[in-house]
């Protein structure tokens, strides 16, 4: 699919708008002509953005996760987009830092709702026996 960036910039100018932030998977694909992995997998907006100005001289910036940046640069080659990656946990921590540095919650916070309910029923039963 060919990007519709030019047509959208034209519509922005017609409506007196300076620019647009495109975050939905469908609209991102419409603007750029391609989509990201997270848009395909999760269908959630915001993982990848296209920030565009109505001025044809200003390039559209694509903000995406660090691990998709190389693919986006390849897909957008020759289209004039600027790819701006942001760091995810992939870029921020190594696997040993993630796996060995995990802070576990204390045992009381790890109890399930059923455990809490059982404790509450026992406490109420004991209180009832003392009163009655």
Predicted regions located by residue number:
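A composition/biophysics-driven feature that prefers long, compositionally simple stretches
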Residues: 1-132
